[in-house]
Amino acid sequence: MQQNYKINWQQCVSDKWQEVLADEAYTVTGTLKFNKGAAIGRTTASKILNAYWHKLDRTFFGHAANKGIGIERWIFSEYGSAGDNLHFHFKAKAPIEPYYFCCIANVMWSKFHRQTARNIYNWITPTILKANSSGYSVKDTRHFTYDAMGLEASHQNKHALDTTTFQNAAQAQRIINKVSIEEITKARQIVDLQIEETIQRIYQRQRKAEVRGTQ
């Protein structure tokens, strides 16, 4: 007798993304925001997003970025619970020590364009809990829609890459040309605060789950 199976494709897609992004190689989890997510158009947002990531690629990999070498990342666009607040979640493999990559990435986004949010409003930290962070980043994939903006800005290198070979004086100079020591110092304070808040949120969710389990 033939059995009928009802497959929840939305959940399957979301689960698969979470599985991929829970890989320990994705050392950074981030959210990039705009000053007015409700006002910015998709075309403008996409252009800013792509240009930003290309600039990051050029900063860390120099001319190799023009040959297809870049920061490996998956990006997901989201509009918020009310559907009127465009922003982007991402998971990335940091090409340098993740903590300092977070500082640099946040500073560069905050001053990239007049419509990109100040660094205190973005959220870029080293990945703290792989399963939780991947689930949060891909939560809108459950809607089973085609994310053209996120896909276009995402990047995977064609071949395995040893990023340490790019950690040299030339890379350091490119970073210094884009981000000042003062900006890094201020960014560290923000990253430290966001790491602490992320840990607190994880703890609070765990406590709530424990309470529900005892009821």
Give the role of each language-model region.
Residues 1-86, 94-215:
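Right-hand nucleic-acid polymerase module
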